A protein has these predicted regions:
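Active-site core segments that coordinate phosphate-bearing ligands/cofactors
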Residues: 1-133, 138-175
Length: 175
C-alpha cells in the first residue's frame, strides 16, 4: 500500500505508519489570524493562551462540526492523492457557523489523512488497535487533542505527561 510508510522503531522493529503531511498547519494560520483580530480589538494574548482558549471551544461544538468542512492541506498529501496544498473551508448557508464548530472542523481536518491511512491498515491489512499513544503539539492543550483524536479514530488515546513535547523529546531520552 503506497499510503503507508514503513519505518523502524528505536529498537529496530518494522512498523507501518499512517503518515500525514498537514496535521495542524492550517489551524496554526487561523489561530494566528484570530490572535491578530483579538489584538486589533485591544486584547493581548500569548500564543499559548490563544491555543488553549480557542481549542478548548471545540469541545462545545456540534458532533458534525455544524456542517463546516475543512481541508487543511497547506502542502500536498500523498495519502489522499493531492500533489499541492489548497486549504479550504466550506459551509452551506444554513451551517451552524460558530467559533466552536470552526475550531472543531479544523481539528478533525488535521486528522483526516492519518485516519485514511488507519483505514488501510485496519480494513485492508486486518491490523488491530487497542490504544493510540498521542504526542506532539496537537496534544498541548489539555484534553482537546486527546478527545478529538479518540472521536476521529474510535480508539482510546492516552498521553504521557510530556505528550506536548513530541517525538524529539523521546529521541533525546534514548540518546
Amino acid at each position: 500500500h503506497p499510503e503507508i510508510d514503513l519505518v523502524s522503531t528505536p529498537d529496530g522493529k518494522l512498523v507501518g505508519m499512517a503518515h500525514s503531511n498537514n496535521c495542524s498547519s492550517d489551524m496554526d494560520a487561523w489561530i494566528q489570524l484570530l490572535g491578530e483580530a483579538a489584538e486589533a480589538l485591544g486584547a493581548k494574548a500569548s500564543t499559548t493562551e490563544l491555543y488553549n482558549n480557542l481549542l478548548q471551544t471545540a469541545l462545545d461544538g456540534d458532533p458534525d462540526c455544524g456542517g463546516l468542512l475543512s481541508y487543511g492541506y497547506i502542502s500536498g498529501e500523498h495519502i489522499t492523492g493531492f500533489e499541492e496544498g489548497r486549504p479550504l473551508l466550506a459551509r452551506s448557508s444554513n451551517s451552524h457557523f460558530t467559533l466552536a464548530n470552526f475550531i472543531r472542523a479544523h481539528l478533525f481536518s488535521a486528522l483526516c489523512a492519518m485516519r485514511t491511512g488507519l483505514d488501510v491498515l485496519l480494513k485492508d491489512e486486518g491490523a488491530q488497535i487497542e490504544e493510540i499513544r498521542g504526542h506532539g503539539g496537537f496534544f498541548k492543550s489539555p484534553e482537546v487533542g486527546q478527545r478529538i483524536m479518540a472521536a476521529a479514530t474510535g480508539t482510546p488515546v492516552s498521553l504521557l505527561q510530556s505528550a506536548g513535547e513530541g517525538g524529539a523529546w523521546g529521541i533525546a531520552l534514548l540518546a
